[in-house]
């Protein structure tokens, strides 16, 4: 009986490990002097280091820094564009990698360089503006 429990435990551990080897790799890029589309999503296998393209955005300006919500349902991005910089919120479908723009807010400063989110807020740090801005979440 003890061997049966050990075998079941090993099967369970193996299946849990197999389930956790693939992740979404979400990559922001600069777009102003190249053909980049903005944000790219890849399937990443942590065991083999292989990655495969899943999806991308269209015409998102310089999403140079990203953060993903704790529940993996939203991606937030800075859109670095000098004094006209913005922060964008996207609905995120983790299975397909699809990102749908929900809204965009002025970054309240130039050249955003860092972005973080918690359960209630999205916070951006602006490099040239020398400030931070806090945006409350509205279901996005």
What are the residue ranges of the model-derived segments?
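Bacterial Sec-dependent N-terminal signal peptides
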Residues: 1-22
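An edge-strand/N-cap motif at the start of beta-rich repeat modules
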Residues: 19-44
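Residue-level detector of Asp-centered blade-edge/turn motifs that repeat once per structural unit
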Residues: 20-21, 68-72, 117-120
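Short loop/turn segments immediately following the C-termini of beta-strands
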Residues: 30-32, 80-82, 127-129, 137
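A short beta-strand motif characteristic of beta-propeller blades
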Residues: 52-58, 100-106
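Short loop/turn segments immediately following beta-strands, especially the blade-tip
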Residues: 42-49, 89-98, 135-140
């Amino acid at each position: 009986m003890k061997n049966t429990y050990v075998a079941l435990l090993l099967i369970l551990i193996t299946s849990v490990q197999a389930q956790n080897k693939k992740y979404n790799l979400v990559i922001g890029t600069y777009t102003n002097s190249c053909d980049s589309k903005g944000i790219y999503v890849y399937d990443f296998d942590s065991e083999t280091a292989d990655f495969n393209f899943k999806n991308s955005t269209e015409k998102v300006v310089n999403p140079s820094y990203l953060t993903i919500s704790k529940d993996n349902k939203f991606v937030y991005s800075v859109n670095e564009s000098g004094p006209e910089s913005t922060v964008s919120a996207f609905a995120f479908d983790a299975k397909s990698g699809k990102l749908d723009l929900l809204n965009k807010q002025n970054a309240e400063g130039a050249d955003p360089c860092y972005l973080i989110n918690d359960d209630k807020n999205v916070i951006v740090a602006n490099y040239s503006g020398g400030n931070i801005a806090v945006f409350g979440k509205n279901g996005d």
